[in-house]
Every structure is written in structure tokens, then in C-alpha cells.
């Protein structure tokens, strides 16, 4: 693992490849996950996923291989794990994940499973040896699912690739995206990663188009499906803001002949009037929605997409800086400065050192850093981990409903700053 990936996985908002692949596997109902590795890796991945996917922990197991297994192999540990699940679990399918160290041993997972004559299919995956991030693990796992698919008769539907329940409000985002597409008469065949069944995911080759919303999670799988099933794909990112959502739908409609945007556009215009009404009421009392500085620190789609919506539709600022948690070729004129975590760390540290107030949209890692530095700020969480706020409602960050929610959150952040200043 490169030093930058290690830092991102263990000290910032990213996690490891084992967690990424487990996040996809655990999202499929009836699927169990065995972590072939130490308890540390197991507990870390299980807890991280279960926090956003209640009940996932009940379908996790760990082989706990000892030091001898690193030399002689983990066959005994795996067989013990299989026997445990025979007695205590009821999997429809089992995914076995080798952690970094066990990946170096080279055990034939599926061969060991075949000798055990198990009543359910077993799929094995290495989590990258000593190299890999959450996105890399998720991408590798999605490609593994594509390998299990068979050609099917084509329909007019689409697949949405690159969503995960493990992302902040990820399941709610998926529900909103499905709602928007169906509002435009676009049938969704499958959305892996957010609770779709195995049967639904295996129907993905029926689709006439793959919509990739996060390149780092799903571009490789889309390329695989283009090669195997001749399904074209478009990379469109995530829809943020009202106008941003309409542009997003227009891009998809250009590729789907049966799409009709009339109902979606009508809803957007209606909701825009509502936002304008509430926004004008607030401006008359508190002034314009302005921040001297705005800082984003999140994955690429969240950072760039929300930044474009924020500056184009909701608020303004003297300077908007983005710290991307992964590199990307995507760009937006809404951003003044772009830095990449693990590449521009010296400049990122300088940004925090010079910070003297404004809005930060990030995870709790960044807000805690500013607190430790005794820097003034107001905040809005747009990515995990989040330690000082609970997310229970089904409100998304993206789409029409997400635009309303984010506008509300950003206004409330501004108001909380006014209240704190009044108290001091």
C-alpha cells in the first residue's frame, strides 16, 4: 500500500479494500461474509458497515488464523469457518475475503470450499495484497459480480452503478435516484450496493445502458459489461441542486430514447419556487447566504457536485477550496482551488493553518482538526465518519429532495454561526 493510501485508509475518511468489498457483498440480502484474517480487520470492517447497514454484523464471520497459517496456509481455518456457518448461519451465498497478509499466502479459497461440499455457492476475493482502498475493494467486488452474470435479452432499462449504502445517506440517495429516473419513465433494472437482491443484480445484462455515478467505484465494472454484454455506459456523477439535477437528467435522457423529463422539470420548478420563498424570508432577516471561505473535504463526486450546486444556486463566497479524498479528472469552474489528499498534503496543511472562519463541508475528521487548532467555523457533514450528528431520516443529499435538505442545512449552519457570535 502506498504511503498516501495508508494515510487515507487509517487516518482520514477512507477505509481499506477489505471494507470496500465487504460493503458491496453485505448489501446483498442473504449474503454472508467471512473475513479470512485477524480480528482487527474483521471488527473494523464489520463495525464500519453495520453502522450504516443495521443487521449486517449478523452476517459477518472471522476465521482468526494464527501465525502458523501465514506459513502453511489457512485451509484449516476456512474449514472451521464453513462448519460454523453450517451450524449457526443460513447463507444463500458466501463471500470469503482474504485480508492483506493472508492474500500473500495464496490459498485457493474456492477449491477449499469445493472439497467441503457446502450447500451454498462460495466466492473468494483477495483484498489487494498490500495495496488498496475502499474504492478499489468495492470496484474489485463489483467486477466479481459481473463475472457471475450471463447474457440476457435486452430491455429498455438502465443500471445505476457506483452507489453504496455505506456512504453518508447512501441508501436515501439511491431511493431518490430511482424515483427521479422512474419519474422520467426510465426503468431501473439494478442498483448494486444499496440493498438490491442477488436476482436483481444478475438481471443487469438486460439493461440498455449503464449509468456510472462514481467512477472510482464502478467504472471498471461498466467497462467489463461493455466488453462482455455490449452495454454502453455514461459517467454522469451524482445530481446535486435543482438545476444540477435537471442537467443530470438531461444527460441521461440524451442516451435513453424513451425518457420524458416533463414531470421531473415540473416538480423541480415547483420546488424551486418554494426554496426561493423560504430563502427570501431568511435573507430579509439575516442577509444573503454568504461565507468568506468555503472548504470541502470529501470524495470527488460529493465535493465537486455539491460545490457546483452551492455556488451556482444557493450561496456565494470569496474563496471555495476543495480537498479531494481521491484523484479525479472531473472539474468544475465553481471551485477556486483543488487539492488531492495524499498528493498535496503540504498545501492542505497550510489551508488549515491559514483558516480564519467560514463554512466547511466534510466529515467529522476535518471539523475535529479545526477544533483542535481552535479555529472558528460552521459546518455541514456530507461524508463519513460523522461522530457529532445522527442520520436516521430518509433524506438524501442528492436529487430534488437532497437539494432542499442541503439548502436547509447550509442556512442552519450560517444561523448557528450568528448565534455563537451573539453569545460571545
Residue ranges and their predicted role:
Residues 1-424:
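An N-terminal assembly and electron-transfer interface module characteristic of large anaerobic redox
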Amino acid at each position: 500500500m502506498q504511503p498516501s493510501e495508508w494515510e487515507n485508509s487509517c487516518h482520514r475518511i477512507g477505509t481499506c479494500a477489505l471494507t470496500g468489498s465487504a460493503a458491496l457483498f453485505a448489501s446483498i440480502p442473504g449474503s454472508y461474509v467471512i473475513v479470512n484474517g485477524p480480528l482487527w480487520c474483521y471488527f473494523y470492517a464489520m463495525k464500519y458497515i453495520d453502522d450504516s447497514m443495521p443487521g449486517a454484523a449478523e452476517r459477518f464471520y472471522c476465521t482468526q488464523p494464527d501465525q502458523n497459517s501465514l506459513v502453511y496456509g489457512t485451509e484449516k481455518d476456512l474449514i472451521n469457518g464453513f462448519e460454523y456457518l453450517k451450524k449457526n448461519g443460513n447463507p444463500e451465498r458466501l463471500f470469503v475475503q482474504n485480508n492483506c497478509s493472508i492474500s500473500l499466502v495464496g490459498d485457493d479459497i474456492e477449491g477449499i470450499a469445493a472439497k467441503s461440499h457446502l450447500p451454498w455457492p462460495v466466492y473468494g476475493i483477495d483484498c489487494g495484497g498490500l495495496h488498496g482502498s475502499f474504492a478499489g475493494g468495492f470496484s474489485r467486488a463489483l467486477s466479481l459480480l459481473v463475472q457471475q452474470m450471463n447474457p440476457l435479452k435486452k430491455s429498455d432499462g438502465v443500471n445505476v452503478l457506483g452507489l453504496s449504502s455505506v456512504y453518508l445517506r447512501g441508501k436515501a440517495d439511491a431511493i431518490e435516484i430511482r424515483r427521479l429516473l422512474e419519474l422520467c419513465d426510465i426503468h431501473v433494472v439494478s442498483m448494486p450496493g444499496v440493498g438490491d437482491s442477488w436476482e436483481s443484480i444478475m438481471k443487469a445484462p438486460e439493461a440498455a445502458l449503464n449509468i456510472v455515478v462514481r467512477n472510482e467505484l464502478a467504472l471498471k465494472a461498466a467497462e467489463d459489461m461493455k466488453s462482455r454484454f455490449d452495454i454502453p455506459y455514461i459517467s454522469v456523477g451524482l445530481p446535486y441542486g435543482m438545476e444540477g439535477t435537471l442537467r443530470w437528467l438531461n444527460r441521461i435522457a440524451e442516451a435513453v430514447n424513451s425518457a420524458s423529463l416533463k414531470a421531473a422539470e415540473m416538480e423541480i420548478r415547483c420546488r424551486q419556487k418554494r426554496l426561493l420563498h423560504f430563502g427570501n424570508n431568511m435573507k430579509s432577516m439575516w442577509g444573503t447566504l454568504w461565507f468568506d471561505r468555503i472548504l470541502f473535504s470529501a470524495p470527488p463526486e460529493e465535493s465537486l457536485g455539491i460545490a457546483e450546486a452551492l455556488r451556482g444556486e444557493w450561496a456565494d463566497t470569496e474563496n471555495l477550496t476543495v480537498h479531494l479524498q481521491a484523484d479525479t479528472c472531473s472539474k468544475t469552474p465553481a471551485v477556486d482551488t483543488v487539492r488531492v489528499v495524499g498528493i498535496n498534503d503540504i498545501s492542505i496543511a497550510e489551508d488549515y493553518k491559514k483558516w480564519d472562519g467560514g463554512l466547511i463541508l466534510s466529515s467529522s475528521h476535518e471539523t475535529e482538526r479545526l477544533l483542535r487548532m481552535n479555529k472558528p467555523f460552521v459546518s455541514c457533514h456530507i461524508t463519513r465518519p460523522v461522530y457529532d450528528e445522527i442520520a436516521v431520516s430518509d433524506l438524501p443529499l442528492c436529487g430534488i429532495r437532497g437539494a432542499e435538505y442541503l439548502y436547509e442545512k447550509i442556512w442552519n449552519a450560517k444561523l448557528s454561526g450568528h448565534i455563537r457570535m451573539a453569545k460571545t
